[in-house]
A protein has these predicted regions:
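Glycan-recognition and catalytic cores of secretory/periplasmic carbohydrate-active enzymes
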Residues: 1-335
C-alpha cells in the first residue's frame, strides 16, 4: 500500500504527529532531556518516571532522521536535549552508558522531576511563570500527587512557538535544570549492556550527523571503545560489563545491534579497522546464531547453555527484533 503517494503521506503524518506529541508531552523530560519509559495516562502526559537506555538510543536516531527530512527546529532541539542528557546523566567514567535511571528518589516516585508552585515562584521571573501558566498547565490543578510535572499542553502542541516564546522556554529549562541538579538524583543502574549501548551509539552517531557536535561523536566513540576493550575478548562478545568485568556470552542482539552501530558511525567518519570489525562480528553471528536448517537466527549462541527452547525474535517489542537487524546489517555488508 505504501507504493501509493497518498498512503505514504498518511504514514508520514502518523509518524510525525506521534513524535511531535511525544516531544511536547509528559513522556519527554522537558527540563533535562531524555524520554521516560512509558506513560500512565491515555494523553501521554504523566509518565512512569523511569528512564531506559534502550528507549532513548533508538528515539534519538528516529528524531535525527525526522529532522533530516523536515528541518523542523523542534526536532533538532529534542535531539540536542536527549544527547545532552545521555552525556550528562548516563555516561559512566569508563565510557559506557548506564542501563537506566530509577523512577524514585528518596523513596518517592517522580520527586526528582516534579515541582511545587512555591519552588517555581522562587526560581522564575514573572514572564516565565506566566509562560508556564499559559502553556504548561501551571494555571490549573497540580497534575501529579500535589505537584506539577511540566509539559506543554495539548492545545499548544498544535501551534508553533515564536522566537520570544522559545527564548523564554530555554531560560526556564536552564534555571530549573540547575536547581534540579542540586536534588538527590534517582538511582542509576550502572551495568553496561552491549546491546543497549550499541543502540545508543547508533543514535548518537545519527545525532552527530545532524548537529555536527563533536562532543556527541566523542561520547559515542567512548562507549564503543569500552565495548572493544572490555566486552570483546577472544573473538567473542560479552553481554554485560559491571565492576570491571565482562560476563555472559553475547546474544544475537549484542552482535546485530553492534554491527548496526558500527555501520552508522562509518557514515559520519571512516575507519577501516571498524569495517573489518563489523565483518568479523558478522562472521561470528553467522557461525554462532544462524539456524542452518530452518533459517533465521537464534537469540542464544550454539555454545550457550542448553535451554528448553531457543527463541527466535522476529517481532519488534521493547527493542528491535534481532532477526530484523541481523538481516539489515548482513545486506548492508553484502552477505
Amino acid at each position: 500500500e505504501l507504493q501509493q503517494p497518498e498512503h505514504r503521506q498518511r504514514a508520514f503524518f502518523m509518524l510525525e504527529n506521534t513524535l511531535r506529541h511525544m516531544a511536547f508531552g509528559g513522556i519527554n523530560d522537558l527540563i533535562g532531556g531524555g524520554f521516560y519509559r512509558y506513560s500512565t495516562d491515555d494523553q501521554w502526559m504523566i509518565p512512569h518516571f523511569e528512564k531506559m537506555l534502550y528507549d532513548n538510543g533508538p528515539l534519538l536516531a528516529l528524531y535525527s532522521d525526522l529532522y533530516s527530512y523536515t528541518k523542523n527546529a523542534l526536532y533538532r532541539r529534542v535531539i540536542s536535549e536527549t544527547a545532552d542528557w545521555l552525556m550528562r546523566d548516563m555516561q559512566l567514567p569508563e565510557g559506557g552508558y548506564a542501563a537506566s535511571l530509577d523512577a524514585d528518589s528518596e523513596g518517592v516516585e517522580g520527586l526528582y522531576y516534579t515541582w511545587q508552585k512555591e519552588q517555581l515562584d522562587a526560581l522564575l521571573d514573572t514572564d516565565e511563570m506566566a509562560f508556564l501558566s499559559e502553556h504548561a498547565g501551571l494555571g490549573g490543578q497540580a497534575n501529579f500527587e500535589g505537584q506539577w510535572h511540566l509539559h506543554i499542553n495539548a492545545m499548544q502542541q498544535q501551534q508553533e512557538f515564536s522566537q520570544q516564546q522559545l527564548a523564554c522556554l530555554e531560560s526556564i529549562q536552564q534555571k530549573l535544570l540547575h536547581a534540579r541538579l542540586q536534588r538527590t538524583p534517582p538511582g542509576r543502574d550502572e551495568k553496561v549492556l552491549t546491546a543497549w549501548n550499541a543502540l545508543t551509539i547508533k543514535g548518537m552517531a545519527a545525532a552527530y550527523r545532524v548537529l555536527q557536535n563533536e562532543d556527541i561523536l566523542a561520547s559515542a566513540e567512548n562507549s564503543l571503545a569500552l565495548i572493544r576493550d572490555k566486552l570483546w575478548q577472544d573473538g567473542r562478545l560479552h553481554a554485560v560489563y559491571q565492576l570491571g568485568v565482562g560476563r555472559l556470552n553475547g546474544y544475537l542482539d549484542d552482535y546485530a545491534f553492534l554491527i548496526d552501530a558500527l555501520l552508522e558511525l562509518l557514515q559520519v567518519r571512516w575507519r577501516s579497522e571498524e569495517l573489518q570489525w563489523a565483518v568479523q562480528l558478522a562472521e561470528v553471528m553467522l557461525e554462532q546464531f544462524e539456524d542452518r536448517d530452518n533459517g533465521g537466527f537464534f537469540f542464544t549462541s550454539h555454545d550457550h547453555e542448553d535451554l528448553l527452547q531457543r527463541p527466535k525474535a522476529f517481532s519488534d517489542e521493547a527493542m528491535p527484533a534481532g532477526n530484523g537487524i541481523a538481516t539489515q546489517v548482513l545486506l548492508r555488508l553484502g552477505y
